[in-house]
Swiss-Prot record:
Primary localisation category: secreted
Site for Reactive bond, residues: 364-365
InterPro entries reported for this sequence: Serpin_CS, Serpin_dom, Serpin_fam, Serpin_sf, Serpin_sf_1, Serpin_sf_2
Pfam families (alphabetical): Serpin
Positions bearing carbohydrate: 159
SMART domains: SERPIN
Tissue-wise expression: Most abundant in seminal vesicles.
GO CC annotations, alphabetized: cytosol; extracellular region; extracellular space; neuromuscular junction; platelet alpha granule
Protein name as catalogued: Glia-derived nexin
GO molecular function: heparin binding; serine-type endopeptidase inhibitor activity; signaling receptor binding
Record flagged with keyword Cytoplasm: no
Keyword Glycoprotein among UniProt keywords: yes
Function of the protein: Serine protease inhibitor with activity toward thrombin, trypsin, and urokinase. Promotes neurite extension by inhibiting thrombin. Binds heparin.
Length: 397
């Protein structure tokens, strides 16, 4: 006998275009840690590819799922995330508000939505809690027409990402008979550098990619004061890191790469956690230096199903075991896909250099160099909360 189970799809889309007021290991840092663990699982199978994810987006989707889960399904989510969303809803709401605050000066938007099959009966407490904690909107769509349903969802995504990401969800991922709902998270960030890279300084330079081949790529260059530092992994591999603040200074890009060119990026990434990144922020010192960084655009779409299963979140994907009775009691649901599409653009754009920076640019003494000419790790961090909005590796710009 063939059993047919209703299911739902989760999608999270993220976009980037160019100390903490919470406790020492905040809820948002715990959520970001989950995203970092997922990232580590992804790069195991894609060590030489460009990969970009949004830990905050992953935490948001899993948080919405946790609100609708019960039994062992909820326990697995809570164990991996290390907190119960219901118990800390007020704090999560405060964190989400801080991330999108206009005080950031840079543009940050986080949007969540649930797309329901026409006539689907969703439990009222789940809908109310989801709206309160994650500001999640609800829309009805006709999943029996997969092309129309995917078009509606993709239109929402395109609108929330300012037209930069479309075609997230293909019609063939929607089962007209069984799909009941699609959860979507979209994160958009556009930041201007605090200290702008001048276009005339951008020149082609050599970048040694993850495959060992050399490529000539456009490199941004700037002489300014940056906070930077170095440390080593538990097994003694040294690496360097540097902070590039955006003009609002509440958000920064952090870049890390091995000190020795013979050390692969994959050797240091497994040791990176939110606690590690916090330690960078606390130990970096300002230095006048020449920074050389690739100008790049990277886009990646990833199904997070297998990485999450590797971390121990398995039941929600199994039709006979998944428990989402807090979403609906009328039928059994399971998750068929968790998709994330992320895009990052790094260029010269930014605010004009300050007078102090201009003065530094013409100073005569010879500064140290920080040259990013081989595979590197980057993160976009919301400093007041410790939230990691974006995380990625670049093997070839």
């Amino acid at each position: 006998m063939n059993w047919h189970f209703p299911f739902f799809i989760l999608t999270t889309v993220t976009l980037y275009s160019v100390h903490s007021q919470f406790n020492s290991l905040s809820l948002e840092e715990l959520g970001s840690n989950t995203g970092i663990q997922v990232f580590n699982q992804i790069i195991k199978s894609r060590p030489h590819e460009n990969v970009v994810v949004s830990p905050h987006g992953i935490a948001s989707i899993l948080g919405m799922l946790q609100l609708g889960a019960d039994g062992k399904t909820k326990k697995q989510l809570s164990t991996v995330m290390r907190y119960n969303v219901n118990g800390v809803g007020k704090v999560l709401k405060k964190i989400n508000k801080a991330i999108v605050s206009k005080k950031n000066k840079d543009i940050v938007t986080v949007a969540n939505a649930v797309f329901l099959r026409n006539g689907f009966k969703m439990e009222v407490p789940f809908a109310v809690r989801n709206k309160d904690v994650f500001q999640c909107e609800v829309q009805n769509v006709n999943f029996q027409d997969p092309a129309s349903a995917s078009e509606s969802i993709n239109f929402w995504v395109k609108n929330e990402t300012r037209g930069m990401i479309d075609n997230l969800l293909s019609p063939n991922l929607i089962d007209g008979a069984l799909t009941r709902l699609v959860l979507v998270n979209a994160v958009y960030f556009k930041g201007l550098w605090k200290s702008r890279f001048q276009p005339e300084s951008t020149k082609k330079r050599t970048f040694v990619a993850g495959d060992g081949k050399s490529y000539q790529v456009p490199m941004l260059a700037q002489l300014s004061v940056f906070r930077s530092g170095s440390t080593r992994t538990p097994n003694g591999l040294w690496y360097n890191f540097i902070e590039l603040p955006y003009h609002g200074e509440s958000i920064s890009m952090l870049i890390a790469l091995p000190t020795e060119s013979s050390t692969p990026l994959s050797a240091i990434i497994p040791h990176i956690t939110t606690k590690t990144i916090d330690s960078w922020m606390n130990t970096m010192v300002p230095k006048r230096m020449q920074l050389v960084l690739p100008k790049f655009t990277a886009v990646a779409q990833t199904d997070l199903k297998e990485p999450l299963k590797a971390l121990g979140i398995t039941e929600m994907f199994e039709p006979s075991k998944a428990n989402f009775t807090k979403i609906t009691r009328s039928e059994s649901l399971h998750v068929s896909h968790i998709l994330q599409k992320a895009k990052i653009e790094v260029s010269e754009d930014g605010t004009k250099a300050s007078a102090a920076t201009t003065a530094i640019l013409i100073a005569r003494s010879s500064p140290p160099w920080f040259i990013v000419d081989r595979p590197f790790l980057f993160s976009i961090r919301h400093n007041p909360t410790g939230a990691i909005l974006f995380l990625g590796q670049v093997n070839k710009p």
